[in-house]
Swiss-Prot record:
This is Extended FMRFamide-2. The modification Arginine amide is found at R8. It is found in: Secreted. One of its GO terms (biological process) is neuropeptide signaling pathway. Disulfide bonds: none annotated. The keyword Secreted applies. Keywords: Amidation, Neuropeptide, Secreted. GO terms for cellular component: extracellular region. FMRFamides and FMRFamide-like peptides are neuropeptides. Belongs to the FARP (FMRF amide related peptide) family. It comes from Karoophasma botterkloofense. It comes from the Eukaryota.
Amino acid sequence: SDYLQLAR
């Protein structure tokens, strides 16, 4: 769970 993944 990365904050970069939810930004995709």
